Amino acid sequence: MDTIQKRYGYTGQGLRVNLTTGKITKEPTFPRFKDEIGGTALGYRVFWDEVPPKTQPLDEANKIVIAPGPFSGSGALCSSRTSITTIYPTIYPMPMIASAHIGGDMAARLKQAGYDFIIIEGKSEKPVYLYINNDNFELRDAKG
């Protein structure tokens, strides 16, 4: 394992969820995100690299990036934050990229499951939700 893989606070992998195909794949955190610290920076890097200019909130090219910071799950004070980066339709006067932040235990749970980020892309034909239990992950029907 080289030095870049030994970064503390990172699990070394994330998930990419394609709602169009239903495919979920693991992706390495490094070396791609070696210069980004925290969920917001990681989210903006994904948008810079992958989302075309002038993408609208409901376009299939838009993505949702869910990413906690490196201290999440460590017990450090104020570290249980998760960043959700996307092109939001509610930003005035026009839709634009932004990050919302949530607290609670989602950040720690995502790290405990072994993931630094989730990139959601595409569009599903029906309502689905992402089920994650450590190395088991799948899209499930949300209609019940």
Identify the role of each PLM range:
Residues 1-144:
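Acidic carboxylate diad motif detector
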